[in-house]
C-alpha cells in the first residue's frame, strides 16, 4: 500500500506506529490528566496541542533539523534542558496544588482551556529526541530513490497522527468517565494527582539525562 508514493512495507509501519503510540509518555499523560480534570473539551484541547506540536516536529525532521540537532550538541542540549525544566515545572505545580489541597472545584468551575492548549503545545515542542526519532523511524519505510520523498514522509506522518488521535480519543473518553467517579472520591483523586506529578518529575529527569 502506498508503494507508488515511495512508502515501503506500510502495514509493518502501521503496526510499529501503534506500538509506539501505546508507549506511555509525558504527552499522553498530560492529555489524560486534563481529560480527567477538565472533561472531554480539556482533553481534546490538550490533544490538539500535542498534534500541532508533533506536526511541527515532523516537518522540522523532514526539513533537515534532525541533522542540525545531531551535529550541534549545544542546540540539542538547549532544547533538552528547556523540555526537562518544563516537565519539572508541570510536575511540581501538580504536586504543590495537590499537597495544598487545591482542586478544580475550589479554583473555578471553568477550566483555563487556552492554558491547557499552550502547555500541551510547549510540552510537545520541547522534545529534541522526537525529531531524531521521526527521522530514524520514518527512513526505514521510505524509498530514497522515489521521485518525491516528501510525499512518502507526509503519508507516514499522517498515519502516525491518526493512530495517535484514535488512542488519545480513547484516553479522553475514558478520562471523562473516570471524572464522574473521582469527584466523589477526594482521597483517590489526591493520590492520582500525586502520582501524575511524580511521573512528570521522572520524565524531566529522564529527558535531562538523554544524549543526542
UniProtKB/Swiss-Prot annotation:
InterPro entries: LeuE-type. GO terms for biological process: L-leucine transport. It catalyses: L-leucine(in) + H(+)(out) = L-leucine(out) + H(+)(in). Keywords: Amino-acid transport, Antiport, Cell inner membrane, Cell membrane, Membrane, Transmembrane, Transmembrane helix, Transport. Belongs to the Rht family. The chain crosses the membrane at residues 12-32, 49-69, 71-91, 122-142, 153-173, 188-208. Exporter of leucine. Pfam families: LysE (PF01810). GO terms for molecular function: antiporter activity; L-leucine transmembrane transporter activity. It is a multi-pass membrane protein. It comes from the Bacteria. Coiled coil: none annotated. This is Leucine efflux protein. One of its GO terms (cellular component) is plasma membrane. PANTHER family: ARGININE EXPORTER PROTEIN ARGO, LEUCINE EFFLUX PROTEIN. It is found in: Cell inner membrane.
Amino acid at each position: 500500500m502506498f508503494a507508488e508514493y515511495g512508502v515501503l512495507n506500510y502495514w509493518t509501519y502501521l503496526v510499529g506506529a501503534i506500538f509506539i503510540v501505546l508507549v506511555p509518555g509525558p504527552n499522553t499523560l498530560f492529555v489524560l490528566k486534563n481529560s480527567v480534570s477538565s472533561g472531554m473539551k480539556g482533553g481534546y484541547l490538550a490533544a490538539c496541542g500535542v498534534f500541532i506540536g508533533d506536526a511541527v516536529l515532523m516537518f522540522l525532521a523532514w526539513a533537515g533539523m534532525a541533522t542540525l540537532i545531531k551535529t550541534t550538541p549545544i542546540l540539542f542540549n538547549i532544547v533538552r534542558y528547556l523540555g526537562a525544566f518544563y516537565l519539572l515545572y508541570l510536575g511540581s505545580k501538580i504536586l504543590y496544588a495537590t499537597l495544598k489541597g487545591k482542586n478544580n472545584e475550589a479554583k473555578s468551575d471553568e477550566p483555563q482551556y487556552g492554558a491547557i492548549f499552550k502547555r500541551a503545545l510547549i510540552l510537545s515542542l520541547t522534545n529534541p529526541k522526537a525529531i531524531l526519532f521521526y527521522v530514524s523511524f520514518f527512513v526505514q519505510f521510505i524509498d530514497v530513490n522515489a521521485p518525491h520523498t516528501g510525499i512518502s514522509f507526509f503519508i507516514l506522518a499522517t498515519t502516525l497522527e491518526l493512530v495517535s488521535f484514535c488512542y488519545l480519543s480513547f484516553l479522553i473518553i475514558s478520562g471523562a468517565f473516570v471524572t464522574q467517579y473521582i469527584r466523589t472520591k477526594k482521597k483517590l483523586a489526591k493520590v492520582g494527582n500525586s502520582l501524575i506529578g511524580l511521573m512528570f518529575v521522572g520524565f524531566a529527569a529522564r529527558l535531562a539525562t538523554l544524549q543526542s
